[in-house]
Amino acid sequence: MKTVILALALIVLASSTQADVIATIKKIDQSPFGRTLFDTIYLELQTGDPLDRLLSTLTDLEDRYVAEQKEDDAKNQEYQGACTVDISAFDKDLAESNRKKIELEARLEGQLYPQRSILEGLVAQKKAEVKGYQKDLDELDAQRAEEHEDFEEKVLEHQEATAIIAEARRLFADNIEHGSFIQKGKATKQTHKFTKEVASMIQKHFTTSAKKTAKFQHRKGYSKLFKAFATIASKVEQLADAGAVQKIIDLADELLAKIADSLSLLRFAEDKRVEAYKKSRNFIVISLNVAGSALANATSDLASLNDIIAQVEASLDTTEQRIENVSADRHDRFTQCEEAVQDYQDARAARTSDRDVVSQTIGLVNKELRTLREQLALRQQAGEEI
């Protein structure tokens, strides 16, 4: 009974093994390389030649696959080692460039830009100061020019009035001493009269002067005074004696003295104004020069700082461009290395597959030649498909 069971088990095992062999043959035949091997084996079987040479060729091919794989493994290891070195160099370069970029940005944002902002504010402040002092100076000069013009006008008016009164006094004085105004050979208490011609001349003098002084900007009272003198001149013929005329002359002298005093006070006040003007102007000029010097220094400092900023910004641009270029080079190199890995893996997988086909075929030829022969014959009968 045990013998029967053992025999049945061997039969089942043999059937199972036979099915596995057929499955292996079909699997090999599905690959182009396996089909080519089977075609070659089938031809060898048909000719009846020994399969030793074929087995030797297959064994050599298997050994060559192993050798090629070892060589490919070594090349891949060397290439990937170079990739690691290159990628590490790129990473080191990028790390250094990024460190430099951070330093440059920190210098710009933390130092140079704030300094520029401060200097720009200082320049703006000093410009405003210079502009303000210049405005004060211009206004002071304009005021001084206006004051001087007023002074000159007042002096001219005083001089005009002095000339008018002096001329009138001369006319009175000359005529009081002239024989035509005194009745000769009579006592001094006798009435003395001006001629109509002299009286008319004096009246005309004061009338013309009154009209002229009416245009004065400062001493408008002279016009009224000279009108009054013109009225007196119209009645000068009725003056009782030379004593009355002398009073007019004395009045003219008094007026001339007052005008002279007024002119002296006017000049004194002008001198004081000039003195005050010079002091004020000197103070403003000093302030203007100080502000101007500070502005020039601040402007120079700002220009120098802008040059430094431009250099740092240019260095930052160069660094950023380098980061971009190195990153692109790293990406390209990394892609090359990854593609090389994929090519290596694909080639290894293909070589392993072909080597397995060769190994399995050698096993079939050595151990399952009968089954292989039958399957190849069936394959040929079925239209070269097992």
Curated annotation (Swiss-Prot):
* UniProt keyword terms in alphabetical order: Coiled coil, Signal
Write out the propeptide range(s).
Answer: 20-48, 184-238
First and last residue of the signal peptide: 1-19
Q: Where in the cell is it found?
A: Trichocyst
- Coiled-coil regions listed in the entry: 51-154, 293-332
Its GO CC terms are: trichocyst
Main localization category: other
Asked whether the keyword Coiled coil is assigned, the reply is yes
The record's similarity note reads: Belongs to the TMP family.
Its function, per the record, reads:
Structural protein that crystallize inside the trichocyst matrix.
Please give the name of this protein.
Trichocyst matrix protein T2-A
Organism (species): Paramecium tetraurelia
The gene is: T2A
